Amino acid sequence: MIYRRLFSKPIVLATLFMFSCSKNSPKTSFDKINYKKPSVSFADFIGSNQCQSCHPDIYEQWKGSTHAMAGGPATPENIIAPFNGNPITLKDAIVYPEKVNSTYQFRITELNGDLRQIVAVEAVVGKGMMYGGGTQTFFGKYDDGTYRFLPFDYSKHEATWFVQLRKDEKWVKIDPQLYLDDLYNWPPHRTLGEIDDISNCQQCHGSQIIAKKIDDVYDVKFTSLSINCESCHGPAKNHATIMSNIVQNVVNEYQTIGIESAVGISTNESLNMCFQCHAVKTPIKNNYLPGENLEEFYSLKLPLLGNENPFSINGRIKTFGYQLNHLFSDCFLSGSMDCTSCHNPHSNDYQDISKNALIGRFDDNQCLSCHVTKTSDIAAHTYHKPESEGSSCIACHMPARQHLAIGTEIKYTRADHTVSIPRPSFDSSQGFESACKQCHADISDQDLQLTVNDWYGTIKPLHPVIANRMKINERTTGADAAKVLLQPNHEHPMGQFANLSYFIKRY
């Protein structure tokens, strides 16, 4: 998700305060390979197929991943929506999703059957693979060179077409009382790639997407609409050339392999690979390419300064967000957890901290490989039967949450990556349904909290940065708030930035 917002000069200057609050990159036990990053251009990227011959095992893992199937051209292999001619009926139009010869298209007619417009589908994003609700979005290619989001989406989980409303940007199922002009993406205006003067979606929906305006047209190019190897590893053209020469004995002396190794990178460097897409960020300049410094192109914290801050005070998503709330997790703040602690970066399957493959997303070894003291008697920790959902680490500490910015009609839940402790009363006070409440909907939050207190006594307190924010009330003066909120000695960059944002906006 991209946040394009202008900030006042005092707010921008105040962010400099946070440099003293930033968490230093943790040291690793590996020495980094001596590799000087070259400048990066689109021509330096060669695509994943070029990696297959030398890395066949890893390529096969990637080929079956959600990244590899994240999008692509409109082909039978990629389309999951029913382009069968069954009508989508609106108040002032009828839309026929259909396949004519090899072309997928939306044929839009007036109610009397007169043709209004035909929009061909050039490409798709998504294949309905996400457990919490998978969707597919469609692009048309326009005469000005842009690829534009079309207004009709498909939910695999709901087995239905849906649209996004113009009035509140919520996702809703097709309703015959809706007009075409009620749809947020009609006429199509959101484009693939970052273009300053029109609504757009950034590089997350493809690999190495570059969009530039040239007079009245746009030059849009990309390596693929899947997430390829170079999205994480950076440009591989030089690497492929060097290694080919070495194999052919063209080069005998020692030299770099032409690509930066991911072995030994810091936790923050590893996270930034994923935060290219799995983060809410504010653009600083356009046309980022993998291999460049992400934070020269995006700020990962400035969205917290906006009026639509997507995070609650302890990091949980309150609108539409991504896994950036990992940075609120104690597993990160007090440990070294990055995305690959749980996710195989090539297959996207699940693994434990030692990189051992797990049987699935709900395998408790994802957590127990670190929290080994809980393994001997899990029921003593959970107060639930060992094989029940109440004894699942994920169910209690990473509950699935609907992204409320898009409403509740179309299921679109994602695991809460703050890895929080269930606190029914606190959770309710912040507008969240606690993990306990998700199963025990008939019990009040107060009674659930009493049960938690009875079982665990005094539970682990909130991080001081979060607890300090809770101390602020309507009578707190600016001077007192500054003492409580602006504490650079604590190590909680996201929480500190959120507190700074609150202080600036209120005081």
Briefly describe each language-model feature range.
Residues I2-I11:
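Bacterial N-terminal signal peptides that target proteins for export
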Residues M18-S20:
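C-terminal motif of bacterial Sec signal peptides marking the signal peptidase cleavage site
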Residues S22-N24:
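Bacterial signal peptide processing site
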Residues P26-P38, F42, D57-M130, T137-Y142, ...:
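Primarily the internal scaffold of c-type cytochrome electron-transfer domains
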Residues S41-Q50:
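Local sequence-structure signature of Cys/Sec-based thiol-disulfide redox active-site neighborhoods
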Residues G47, W186-T191, D216-D219:
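Second-shell loop/turn segments in exported
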Residues T191-I195, C331:
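Exposed beta-sheet edge/beta-hairpin loop segments within beta-rich domains
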Residues N200-C201:
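Long, basic N-terminal domains or extensions that often function
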